[in-house]
């Protein structure tokens, strides 16, 4: 069984998609071993509790220095003994020590077709605002492994979503979630859980 820990900062809609997929068998060979948030008010913690998944908050605000936070945060992650760490809307910079320790074992969902609208400053609604301002006709989502850069790790899965006339950032965000994020994130976890994903020279191969 693949032991999966999920890190999340907000409402946890992607977390819910993962939970649902594990429970309905879309994700196989997987156990959700814990949820960690940097926000004690994150509804994601409630979602986890509703499904008897251990959940806790570790916030940078509770520590005098970022080094102290990084140390405790990494300890809490290590305690879960995860085989895979999923960033599902986690708005805290991951310590580099954690990235090196869990090389190619951390994945992130980003609400654009990387390399478009990604990197520093592109998160949440800002991605969709930028896409509409540029006038693109197709947007989407990307699941990728996490490296030391911002949204620069090897790409696992992508799914495109059409922009429709009259879209607002909020409407587009919801469509990207429903048509892309909530589908490819569970799919990526299932592929990894079943040993179908390999990384070589910065590129992902998926066994059929």
Residue spans of the language-model regions?
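One-carbon transfer enzymes
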Residues: 1-208
């Amino acid at each position: 069984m693949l032991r999966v820990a999920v890190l999340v900062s907000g409402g946890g809609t992607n977390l819910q998609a993962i939970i649902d997929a594990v429970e309905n068998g879309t994700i196989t060979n997987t156990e959700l071993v814990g949820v960690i948030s940097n926000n004690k008010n994150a509804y994601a913690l409630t979602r986890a509790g509703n499904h008897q998944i251990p959940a806790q908050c570790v916030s940078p605000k509770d520590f005098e220095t970022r080094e102290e936070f990084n140390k405790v945060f990494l300890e809490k992650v290590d305690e879960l003994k995860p085989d895979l760490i999923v960033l599902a809307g986690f708005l805290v910079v991951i310590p580099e020590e954690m990235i090196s320790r869990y090389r190619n074992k951390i994945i992130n969902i980003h609400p654009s077709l990387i390399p478009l609208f990604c990197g520093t400053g592109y998160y949440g609604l800002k991605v969709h605002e930028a896409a509409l301002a540029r006038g693109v006709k197709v947007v989407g989502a990307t699941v990728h492994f996490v490296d030391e850069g911002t949204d620069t790790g090897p790409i696992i899965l992508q799914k495109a979503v059409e922009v429709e006339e009259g879209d607002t950032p909020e409407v587009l965000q919801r469509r990207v979630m429903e048509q892309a994020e909530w589908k490819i994130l569970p799919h990526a976890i299932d592929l990894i859980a079943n040993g179908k994903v390999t990384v070589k020279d910065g590129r992902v191969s998926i066994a059929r």
